[in-house]
Amino acid sequence: MSNASLLSTEAAAALLKAATADGRSIAPLRDRLAIADQDSAYAVQEINTRAWLAEGRRLVGRKIGLTSLAVQAQLGVDQPDFGMLFADMAVGDGEIVAAGRLIQPKVEAEVALILGRDLTQERHTYADLIRATEYAVPSIEIVDSRIENWNIKFVDTVADNASSGLFVLGGRPVRLSDIDLTACAMEMKRGDEIVSRGNGRACLGSPLNAAIWLADMMVRCGRPLQAGDIVLTGALGPMVAVKSGDRFDVSIDGLGNVSALFA
């Protein structure tokens, strides 16, 4: 591809925004961006974040992706990534998700943290995070990709809002002092079949490690985490592709259950 035909960050953002609105996928961006690096990918994401906020979408939190070392190795990176959570991405526990809302969805079981205080320091400690966290709940992240056939590398997924789709929160808040998030076991069923298992160690050694990484990163990016924000800390086990009619039930020891249904 000639330099003249390479995409600017603005052009790449426009392609992704249109794909999101139209419910369609596009070719990978990594070989089409004029500068295909981490900074450019987050610049694309930020352009669309600002556009969506200007259109009235409400920011309610962040998601952390690539918290599995195996997935990082697959994509050739040594760190997680993040994306924005908007209010219109929330789905009620057990609510049916219409097929038309998504392109090529997959589900992941995660721990969600709800913040009660801002996290604004340059470097945060476990104590900072524990003080700032109001409670934890079980969650299902319904990831989706605007990139054809999930043919993604780091630049593609970051630009595409970290492959965000929708999310479901469970209904039983638990304080961090009442649960061991490192050892907590997770089981996901599709119908009666167990399709994913894992525990807190699968998420950067602990969901708390992932949340601290995010808190520090958000300060550097100028969008620090605030009281009331939702933080999806990353997958506790393998993600699973979704088919029409599927029902997924997730159980996380010490946190409880959460479900997602697909029309």
From Swiss-Prot:
It catalyses: (S)-4-hydroxy-2-oxopentanoate = (2Z)-2-hydroxypenta-2,4-dienoate + H2O. GO terms for cellular component: cytoplasm. It comes from the Bacteria. The keyword Metal-binding does not apply. Keywords: Aromatic hydrocarbons catabolism, Lyase. Pathway: Aromatic compound metabolism; 3-phenylpropanoate degradation. The keyword Lyase applies. Its EC number is 4.2.1.80. Belongs to the hydratase/decarboxylase family. MhpD subfamily. Catalyzes the conversion of 2-hydroxypentadienoic acid (enolic form of 2-oxopent-4-enoate) to 4-hydroxy-2-ketopentanoic acid. This is 2-keto-4-pentenoate hydratase 1. It comes from Dechloromonas aromatica (strain RCB). The lineage of its organism: Bacteria, Pseudomonadati, Pseudomonadota, Betaproteobacteria, Rhodocyclales. The gene is mhpD1.
